[in-house]
């Protein structure tokens, strides 16, 4: 029987000299689009890095796509798409050449989706990656992540360098292409996650509140305060 949650985080703790991610717990239901927000330094990226096994946690347990950290294998990792602020590709390759590379790497690679996204995001197919601006690099990273039909997609501040129009194209593409799959968007701008099924607000005391955009505004807590500041 397939588990109801794509991600289960229980008591995740990571301590640095001047910062502690302190026993945070949350679940991400399968097939949902979830936002994780919080002020700078709240630990959003630290949490995601621990979930992906990129840093060693100090305490807690994590289950991703039904696998614990110890059970995680290459086949499961190939079902996960990740876009970080600063994602990189070989500088000498163009998006057109990258298409050939990813056709070999991903069994589920969809070049029709890929080239459609390149066009929508105004990315040149023949230009080398090393000649791309930061915003163009982020657009390409997102196009790649969405084109191999990840079962679980994580975007960590992936749209922070994009203009409003490009961000809207990306958000609409996520909603369309990830239908029935799971996506987690880590963001500082609330506009990035307003349409998410569920939003988690991370603070220095862990998950402060959760709910939809409308529910959190009605509650009048930390999310509503951040929303008012951004208006």
Residue ranges and their predicted role:
Residues 147-151, 180:
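A short, proline-enriched helix->beta-strand linker immediately N-terminal to the Walker B motif
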Residues 132, 155-220:
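ABC-family ATPase nucleotide-binding domain "signature/switch" substructure
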Residues 9-12, 19-29, 60, 170:
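Conserved beta-strand
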Residues 34-36, 48, 216:
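Short hydrophobic beta-strand immediately N-terminal to the Walker A/P-loop
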Residues 52:
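Helix-to-loop junction immediately C-terminal to a conserved catalytic motif
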Residues 39-43:
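Walker A (P-loop) phosphate-binding loop of ABC-type ATPase nucleotide-binding domains
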Residues 82-140:
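ABC-family P-loop ATPase nucleotide-binding domains
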Residues 60-71, 75-76:
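Conserved ABC transporter NBD signature motif
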